[in-house]
Amino acid sequence: MANLGYIQVVRHCNHFCGFCSNPTTPYTHDFESMRVLVDDLVARGYFGVIMTGGEPTLHPELPRIVAYAAERGLHVRMITNGWRLGDRAFAAELAAAGLRLVHVSIYSVRPEVEARLRGAEGTLGRAFAALDAAHAAGIEVNVNCVINRLNADHLDESVRYLIAHHPFVRHFVWNNLDPSMGRAEVNQESFVPRLADFELSLHRALRLLERSGRSFRVEKVPLCYMTEFAWASTETRKIVKLEERVVHFLDDKQTVRQTEWEHLYAPGCAACSLRPICGGLFDRGEAYDPAELAPVFVDMEGVVRRILEDPSDPSRRWSSLAAWRRDFAAARAGGDVGASGGVAGDDGSSEFRRDVLRDMQIGAVSVPVGRVTARGRRLYEARRRSEGEKAEALGVQMERGAAASGDGEATGEG
């Protein structure tokens, strides 16, 4: 199976997104603490590692840990805002170290929207420069986009622009905003879209990508809002292929292993033909409305077949659809898949408490992730003061708590 692990290299950032899922913490890494995490993923037999953050390019030893992960045989990827990657010498250094693929986050090709979402001016031009620099260095380039209230109506516009001006970008990842963690949790009115807000724009974007011969994945969008492209759902692909992921969080959560991908459903979802392979509503019904969900009636095995026969996917292969059915049924019976989906009541509430559902979805693993030092604490406090000033200037709220931040992120999985 093509399991991918995540290492949060840092948790600070040079941007200030009002919906950030993994904001600043006092934890820090050095090379040795990251090396242990790379070894952990190798020991698990994982295919690759995604270096993420915060903004991973801010760590001074990023090229060294990339080189180590590549030497250990991992396919090394990185998620970045692109601010530093636009430096062609830096991009070349990362390529030489073994970085194979980079996900550059671009939320909108409208400069004013991108600046508002990033909390900084000039970010769009730097992201475009990062695309070009990475491509020139021989790094495969993907684009990540978090779907939110400010870009929900023009996702297809961004695709059209990027195809025209950066034609070497061949893969896109769409992440529907998770409003249950980080700053998004306290700024829902500003950033969380309704599912219907982006349905048409997303469909147009995916159609454009498909017709241009590009690939794409979509995260945290229920299949009733992307039925034609159900095979491209990240959660659906993980459910079908019985995959897991490990995230080495640089906060109080530390290392977690996720093996289940189903979340919240409306009562009507029980009749849906795609229910067994749908991730449902990611936020457990606290911001999105389960009333927006509706059953669809299409051939589920047609979706499964397209996922299993994908020639670009390095996952395990089943010898036949019948063999997959047996494994899938056994996994569901054993609780590895599908045991944790909550059902929304008539009032939209979940039958599961948030903490219970999280415990069912995420299993802790005892691998130490970073540490809190006196210097790290001082830097954290200084960053929090600076971020507080930015939040006030932008009219957004700071996240709840201090060190812990939530249980997921925009992953960029392919």
Describe every region a protein language model picked out.
Residues 1-33:
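Canonical Radical SAM [4Fe-4S] cluster-binding loop centered on the CxxxCxxC motif
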Residues 8-16, 55, 269, 275:
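Cysteine-centered iron-sulfur cluster-binding motifs in ferredoxin-type domains/subunits
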Residues 15-17, 113, 180-185:
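Short acidic/His/Gly/Ser-rich catalytic and metal-binding motifs that mark active-site loops
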Residues 24, 53, 106, 176, ...:
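Residues that line or immediately flank small-molecule/substrate-binding pockets and catalytic motifs
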Residues 26-28, 55-57, 149-151:
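Short, small-residue-enriched loops and turns at beta-alpha junctions
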Residues 35-50, 59-176:
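Radical SAM/AdoMet-radical enzyme domain recognition
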Residues 120, 124-125, 132-257, 261:
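Radical SAM enzyme [4Fe-4S]-AdoMet core and its adjacent flexible, acidic
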Residues 230-231, 237-414:
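Flexible mid-to-C-terminal extensions adjoining Fe-S/redox cofactors in radical SAM and related proteins
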